[in-house]
Amino acid sequence: MPNPNLEAVERCQPADNIDVVKICGLLPYEIAREVAKADCVVICCHRTRYTAGLTTVVEALALGLPIICSRNPQIPVDFDRLGCGISVEYGDVEGWQRAVEYIASHPEEARKMGCRGRELAERMFNDERCAKEVAEVIKEISL
């Protein structure tokens, strides 16, 4: 099945200082090592009714990396409003290109986006909050 977002990214001609890394399959350690070296994380997804890309979002936030992501209304992070990344509409080729070029040409702002993302991860996506939410669900279903 064709993915217009991936095709849009592949059509972009990245600047010399941008490496595009596509990883397919489950290689968690290798993926984590590659992501940690990145200047930015790009998450390009199909239009869905579920949270495609959420794990990658949380990982990028935790690593303090700015994010460029398809505007999936199911992802509970408004990257633009929170200042931790850039959202791009599905299939918006020029939007993807502008977002990548912006991150590449504004390294200090990209660094600040990453810092804001890390702060968000520490506040919202931490083990304490996760444990509390799991405990609440278990408590609810055990009644």
Predicted regions and their residues:
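Conserved acidic donor-binding segment of nucleotide-sugar-dependent glycosyltransferases
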Residues: 82, 86-93, 102-107
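Short acidic alpha-helix that forms the nucleotide-activated donor recognition element
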Residues: 27-39, 62, 80
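Conserved acidic donor-binding loop of glycosyltransferase catalytic domains
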Residues: 43-45, 70-72, 77, 88-89
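Nucleotide-activated donor-binding/catalytic signature segment of Leloir-type glycosyltransferases, i.e.
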Residues: 8-30
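A short, well-ordered alpha-helix in the C-terminal region of glycosyltransferases
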Residues: 98, 102, 109-123, 136
